């Protein structure tokens, strides 16, 4: 049996960072979202025992090939749809509670399904909000989607769970690519949908209306380190509605996280404290806030960081290779086969 609880996470200045979710117990094998790994840099992201994405790391560790499985039987049934009454209930709690309440809403949705979608670990939901890009040519203009930029709010302390996303790294939601190379050196993190949406669906029109009214719930994404990508868990139609309206949405980023402490270096502490005392003696008017911040940094040894677990169950990857080969051939993507299987980046003719 699986049970869970959450707590609001604050930085040392008491600014809200997000919602920490602890999951304990046992999840039936193969039902939760999980990463599998094997030899030759081969990976698979699975849901309910079926692969959502296959991945193959390049041999020079400069990127990863992603193959999207459009045939997954549960693509459209991951979470229950957000209803109008859900939006109204959260609106009644006020603007200040909007983001935190959506974190709680999605935590419940992920865990209260008949088979919880999160494995027993520590999880974190953090907001990633529209931000300005520091480019002079964007001044006094309305940026197009390629110029959108999103980041987590700033925090005090050593919190290594900060996210960023560029609009130019959005992938098509109406006709997602079967195969994509993620460049770890020159590209940003990709935003990957799990299935193609219907651009004529009635709910898309409804979400466009909510977007114009400023009532669009956040898009829920999962950051997966091994894929260097954000995978949309909930909100494909909300995201597309925002793109069509030209109004940047907000995101909630789900990730695994861990907390550790730096080892104590007493000699370093003593050196810094002597230097600060000397600074105050020589300059009584020095910035006390700066000195206090240095002391806080000196004694605060905790740091929070994101991680992604995987189960090493793919072995030598022969079964993985058979699945990928059959899938790419069914969809006329054989031109990518050699690169995906071998972790290479040779020129590929357009496979359509």
Predicted regions and their residues:
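N-terminal intrinsically disordered, low-complexity regulatory segments of eukaryotic proteins
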Residues: 3-23
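A sequence-level detector for short glycine-anchored, His/Arg-bearing signature motifs
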Residues: 229-244
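C-terminal catalytic or substrate-handling cores of phosphate/nucleotide-
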Residues: 309-352
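Surface-exposed polar/charged interaction patches
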Residues: 93, 108, 112-113, 210, ...
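Short alpha-helix boundary/capping and kink motifs at helix termini
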Residues: 19-231
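Short glycine-/polar-rich loops that comprise or flank the Walker A/P-loop
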Residues: 246-249
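Amphipathic, charge-rich alpha-helical segments that serve as recognition/docking helices
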Residues: 258-322
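Short beta-alpha junction loops
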Residues: 224-226, 253-260
